[in-house]
């Protein structure tokens, strides 16, 4: 995490405090709701089923998210960082062509397309990563951009409820605006890992201990996307360089065109809005 000076601390403290206050209120409301339900049904459910949000791990995560936002290397109209990412095998034929260096022992293998069963898979903990990582390739984020076409980049992870909730809306954009823009999902570190800071309503995915774990989660997230709304999905490298460069932390949307940032989305989760990207693409489509 970047070094934090006093000025940055003073700038981000109000946001950190307001987010922690929101988490405290959320926990209080959840407790009262469970207590009321228990009194009405004369039964009690363990708090293990309702993890608290205001925890030491949660506050650290909120703090880190604001530090990343303050130190992001992008600005509207500025150059887009060409971060290192890991491409998965089995991209759809409608994806733009790109050049990547195949990883490890499978550099001469042809990626195997995902089967129907794999496409229907939900995000679960998996210890078998060989089949997923065998067709990965080291790439750069801007390898997926084409000249004069907007590239919509969607950063997020399956354990973050707002990201998953708006995934269908994002897939609608992929389907409806394929003629004017390209799309890319960058799978970053888990926002709410099940073994550290789980969120109610989030998919249960543990922390990524190795690149294979992240590639498995990214591959399974791609399986949740409908065929007509599917786009390339890549994984951030384990040094989280894309996450740091773009100041993501939880989820964020960008539009890149000709190497420049044309749309800079708000900080997730509260200002992560797919509808704003839709408005941007509608203006692009109308100008053609």
UniProtKB/Swiss-Prot annotation:
One of its GO terms (cellular component) is endoplasmic reticulum membrane. Induction: Treatment of larvae with thyroid hormone T3 causes a significant decrease in intestinal levels. The thyroid hormone synthesis inhibitor potassium perchlorate (KClO4) significantly increases intestinal levels. Thyroid hormone T4 causes a decrease in intestine at day 3 of treatment but levels return to normal by day 6. Expression is significantly reduced in liver in response to all three treatments. The active site is at residue 160. It is a single-pass type III membrane protein. It is found in: Endoplasmic reticulum membrane. Residues 27-288 are cytoplasmic. Expressed in intestine, liver, kidney and brain of immediately premetamorphic larvae, of larvae in all stages of metamorphosis and of parasitic feeding juveniles. In immediately premetamorphic larvae, levels are significantly higher in intestine and liver than in kidney and brain. The chain crosses the membrane at residues 6-26. Signal peptide: none annotated. InterPro entries: Iodothyronine_deiodinase, Iodothyronine_deiodinase_AS. Its EC number is 1.21.99.4. Residues 1-5 are lumenal. Residues 99-130 are annotated as: Disordered. Belongs to the iodothyronine deiodinase family. Plays a crucial role in the metabolism of thyroid hormones (TH) and has specific roles in TH activation and inactivation by deiodination. Catalyzes the deiodination of L-thyroxine (T4) to 3,5,3'-triiodothyronine (T3), 3,3',5'-triiodothyronine (rT3) to 3,3'-diiodothyronine (3,3'-T2) and 3',5'-diiodothyronine (3',5'-T2) to 3'-monoiodothyronine (3'-T1) via outer-ring deiodination (ORD). Catalyzes the phenolic ring deiodinations of 3,3',5'-triiodothyronamine and 3',5'- diiodothyronamine. This is Type II iodothyronine deiodinase. The gene is dio2.
């Amino acid at each position: 995490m970047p070094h934090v000076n006093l000025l940055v601390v003073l700038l981000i403290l109000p946001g950190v405090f307001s987010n922690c206050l929101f988490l405290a209120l959320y926990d209080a409301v959840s407790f009262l709701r469970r207590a009321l339900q228990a009194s009405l049904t004369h039964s009690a459910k363990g708090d293990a089923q309702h993890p608290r949000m205001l925890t030491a791990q949660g506050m650290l995560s909120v703090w880190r998210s604001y530090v990343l936002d303050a130190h992001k290397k992008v600005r509207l109209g500025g150059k887009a960082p060409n971060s290192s990412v890991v491409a998965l095998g089995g991209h759809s034929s409608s994806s733009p062509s790109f050049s990547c260096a195949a990883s490890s022992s499978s550099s001469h293998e042809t990626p195997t397309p995902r089967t129907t069963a794999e496409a229907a898979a939900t995000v679960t903990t998996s210890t078998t990563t060989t089949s997923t990582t065998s067709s990965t390739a080291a790439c750069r984020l801007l390898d997926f951009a084409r000249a004069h076409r907007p590239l919509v980049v969607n950063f997020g992870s399956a354990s973050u409820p707002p990201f998953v909730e708006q995934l269908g809306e994002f897939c609608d954009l992929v389907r409806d605006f394929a003629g004017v823009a390209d799309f890319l999902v960058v799978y970053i570190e888990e926002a709410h890992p099940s073994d550290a800071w789980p969120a109610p309503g989030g998919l249960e995915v543990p922390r990524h201990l190795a690149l294979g774990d992240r590639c498995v989660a990214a591959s399974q997230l791609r399986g949740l996307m409908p065929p007509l709304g599917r786009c390339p999905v890549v994984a951030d490298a384990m040094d989280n360089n894309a996450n740091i460069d773009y100041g993501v932390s939880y989820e964020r949307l960008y539009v890149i065109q000709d190497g420049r940032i044309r749309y800079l989305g708000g900080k997730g989760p509260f200002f992560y809005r797919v509808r704003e990207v839709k408005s941007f693409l509608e203006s692009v489509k109308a100008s053609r």
